[in-house]
Amino acid sequence: MLSLFYQRISTYIKLSASSLLSILPLYRPFQRRRLTMPSNEGSISSSSTTRPKDVLVVGGSYSGLAAALNLLDLCQGRSCRFAGALDPEISEPAEMRERVPVQITIVDERDGYFHLIGTPLAFASEEYALSAWRKFADIPALQTPAIKFIQGSVTRVDCERKISTIKEAGTNNEISQKYDYLVASSGLRRTWPSAPQSLNKDKYLEEVGEHIAKIKMANGGVVVIGGGAVGIEMASELKEMHPDLRVTLIHSRAKLLSSEPLPDEFRDRALELLHETGVETILGSRVIRTTQTELNGAATPSYTLSLTDGRTIKAGYVINAISKYSPTTAYLPSSVLDKEGYVKVNSALNFTDEVPNAKYHFAAGDLALWSGIKRAGRAMHHGHYVGMNIYQQLLNERFGTKPKFSEMAHAPPSMAVAVGKNTVAYGTEQGVVSGEEIAKIFFEDDLGFGICWRYLKLGEAPK
């Protein structure tokens, strides 16, 4: 599911806000509308006695962390950490960087940041899995009194009173917490193996260990069901990490990635790269039944898969990678949700006016009802804009300045899929590109973990 970067990338794509964020499979996704903001000269200066504004961020993944950290940068008088992605002429001018006291609370069901893009590799390599999950308490960028973390889930939001109800993990104690601004960035509920189901690192490592143990015992090979991005990446990473393992991918449609609005050239190239990796494929036939054979003294289990075309396939382990997901928005008023549960937003990522105090409520990332294929790069871009827009409102409240909001542009479909050592990518301007060099640009050698970590500056302690 994405990426960002430095000198090596400028040789391939012009370094700009859009290209920087395209590195997490999307190309030139957004533009920023520039408005004029009056100078703050003569306004009331910051005071240490002013009550900090409380910002509640629901979800601590790509969009939530991007919103929290960019907002904190601005409120502490610095350029936001994503400002390097912007051309100098659209970066925040110095007069915008007034200090504003802020207290940010991040609520997440997990005890840490998990690099979701790397899920296929995490489920193939225990060594990689260990680094893909970082506890919030161990992330240097979050170690500041201005950021508080609660492991738990938000169960209700009262937009009119600006009060949330939070259920703490472990104790199930309910906390009533007031806020001045809310960022809904809790993402999508993904089924296994699109994401680990564990909520703390120790359990996650057990989950991964059990899965990889079954892979190693699969004498009859592994079958991956589903030819979307998750299935393709899962199958190819298994083959890369376990080259002697027979891996077969089964997809019910004639083309891979059949649910995405992408050109056939992209789908065909993904299939070619999958075959180059050594993965076998069966297309155009659906699995209608999976039967586990009795062990009868055998050391490893065996499975028989029956297909709609009459064939039967034997396997030592079966992975159902047909992605199922839904927005995690049950805590929000139904009036701001569409029929599928996505949050209705305007171009500044505010809730639409169906709820009271809409301008104090934002949605970012996969749960926001906005155009484009949902990707981590886009989620971080959402968070960036939300952070800047909250800061603009804080300046308005504190100094009376006219807000200069950053507005999202609608984005066409774009995607990059890692296929072993290669990557195939598509954008409306670039078309379909693929190869190992493309993989280095989009994912480096760790499915984008280092790229996202550096871009979010998670390893840098607060100044």
Swiss-Prot record:
Q: What does this protein do?
A: Oxidoreductase; part of the gene cluster that mediates the biosynthesis of hydroxamate-containing siderophores that play a critical role in virulence via intracellular iron acquisition during macrophage infection.
| PANTHER family per record | APOPTOSIS-INDUCING FACTOR 1 (PTHR43735), NUCLEOTIDE-DISULPHIDE OXIDOREDUCTASE AMID-LIKE, PUTATIVE (AFU_ORTHOLOGUE AFUA_1G17180)-RELATED (PTHR43735:SF24)
- What is the name listed in the Swiss-Prot or TrEMBL entry for this protein? Oxidoreductase OXR1
Q: What induces it?
A: Expression is induced during iron deprivation and is regulated by the transcription factor SRE1.
Record-level GO cellular component terms: cytoplasm
Which domain of life does the protein's organism represent? Eukaryota
Q: Name one Pfam family in it.
A: Pyr_redox_2
Entry EC number(s): 1.-.-.-
InterPro entries (UniProt xref): FAD/NAD-bd_sf (IPR036188), FAD/NAD-binding_dom (IPR023753)
Gene behind this chain?
OXR1
